[in-house]
């Protein structure tokens, strides 16, 4: 490296680059969504913990999804909110890399947890007689733990490759957080290896699991159509359609973000996609997948009735 090159110690997050009045509006809007994300997922966690009827594999995975969603949003949104009301929109380099690591780790964990939830529904509907044998507590614990451990290890691989690069500028990131592809642009060296590893990892984490999900749901659809009871068929369709909606929203936006050609969308559209699956998707999960669920509603009524009678 040339002697006149200097290592950057802080990064400027350009954010949304809008008028100050609009920044205040966005601050209030995003703060509301972030608060609802924490509240909605927190309610789900509390209900699953308090109500023994929800101590089933499906809701164990759902509790992990709620934790991931809260962590996922909290890795980026607080700094984004702070930058919307601060004149100096900077972040030190070490916290920037930490933010990249946490964001990647939680994103990968969410992908894998969604796949585990799909597997749980597949076993419940296609192999109902063996469900309690296949999806026992030991299996659920191993599957959930594997999701978390593998996700953080894969994120660590990306961060290790990033830290091998020399960072001497530019100092600005045209994003509202330290998104990994934006961090690549800070390096004053060839990042093709990083980009290849990121693309390969995205294909492995996004395309592969999504194909498994779609194949599983084809089997689930066939099994549902064979159910004789109309009520049972409606309940199965309701649960599975909710999960498929969540999977489609998350995987679809992530695939467009990380695997579509660069020329297909501008940096501003990339920010909107990032905003969707870092802020909007975590609030949609409890609404789509839980709060419309009769068992969750019943658990909420029981908890409120218990509190009222005390």
Swiss-Prot record:
The chain crosses the membrane at residues 25-48, 57-78, 100-119, 139-157, 195-218, 236-258, 272-291. It is found in: Cell membrane. Residues 49-56, 120-138, 219-235, 292-310 are cytoplasmic. Glycans are attached at residue 4. It is a multi-pass membrane protein. GO terms for molecular function: G protein-coupled receptor activity; olfactory receptor activity. SUPFAM superfamilies: Family A G protein-coupled receptor-like. Gene3D superfamilies: Rhodopsin 7-helix transmembrane proteins (1.20.1070.10). PROSITE patterns: G_PROTEIN_RECEP_F1_1, G_PROTEIN_RECEP_F1_2. Residues 1-24, 79-99, 158-194, 259-271 are extracellular. The keyword Transmembrane helix applies. GO terms for cellular component: plasma membrane. Signal peptide: none annotated. Disulfide bonds join 96-188. Keywords: Cell membrane, Disulfide bond, G-protein coupled receptor, Glycoprotein, Membrane, Olfaction, Receptor, Sensory transduction, Transducer, Transmembrane, Transmembrane helix. Pfam families: 7tm_4. PANTHER family: OLFACTORY RECEPTOR (PTHR26453). Belongs to the G-protein coupled receptor 1 family. Odorant receptor. This is Olfactory receptor 2A12. It comes from Homo sapiens. The lineage of its organism: Eukaryota, Metazoa, Chordata, Craniata, Vertebrata.
